[in-house]
Amino acid sequence: MTRAIITGAAGFIGSHLSEKLLAEGYTIVGIDNFDPWYEPKIKQQNIESPLKHKNFSLIEADIRSFDFLSLFKKNDTVFHLAARPGVQDSWGQGFLNSVENNIYGTQRIFEAALHAGVRRVTFASSSSIYGSSATGPERKVNPISPYGVSKAACEQLAEVYRERGLDLVPLRYFTVYGPRQRPDMAMNRLFRAALPGSFRFPLRGNGNQRREFTFVEDIVDATVRAGYTLKSPSLEAFDIGGGVSASLAEVMALVEQITEASIRVDQYPVADGDPLITVASTEQASKLLGWKANTSLQDGLQQHYESFSE
């Protein structure tokens, strides 16, 4: 039976990936440090279902210090999702967390995977690496936030380890939403601001910022395909996006339609490091992974809302 490692297994995307692979018959070892950056009990709830499965085991460990080598020797595929997320939290002293978790932690995983003879490492990069050049065929990696810099550095590390023979696949996720989304992320905040209570959505700018929102199940589908369907070795980095770019104002209108309520808003200036628009180029993902997003924004928001209001 195929065995795989998932770092960040109790997180938003990692818990969905764990469930997907278990349902397909894989044996999974999940790694998570339950960082109190947000409430650990949320992650504990995320991972409840996998923990009940006979083919799942969980190691509570930190990627900055855990000895991966012996574990990796027993597994053929690694899905590396563990990271310190968040553009705004990466400014100032917060960048140290980005460096330690995203860059150093990733380098340790690549190093161990190389020496353990792992077949492939598929890892989560981000649309943040594009910065303001996030559209058009000539766009370049040009991050405008410390978080984006940390993710771009991970991709550069991937190039270095590819030269040494490690098969690595970076996936540039575009604005992921859906059930179990982190509490600091926009969709959760929008629904909180529409449902009864006192929470108000912190709207930065006028809502004209456009994002390519991607439903978590589509993200997981692409991730599994990158891990197992893609021919080896891979020399690609793939944009993984939902197919349609929508403005925040348009999303707010959809949330109000779904909840039949008005969103409470406090308005602030545009945040540093926040690009005006992100648009994915998914042609390579379609060609080499056989992947495309299947969830419309309307349907994805409905599923997000139903899980949020449970």
Where are these regions (language model features)?
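C-terminal substrate-binding subdomain of Rossmann-fold SDR/epimerase-dehydratase oxidoreductases
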Residues: L17, L195-E310
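Conserved active-site region of classical short-chain dehydrogenase/reductase
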Residues: I103-E111, D184, E217-V220, V224
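The catalytic Tyr-centered alpha-helix of NAD(P)H-dependent dehydrogenases
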Residues: R139, P143-S150, Y173, P179, ...
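Residue-level recognition of beta-strand->loop/alpha-helix junctions
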Residues: R172-T175, Q267-P269
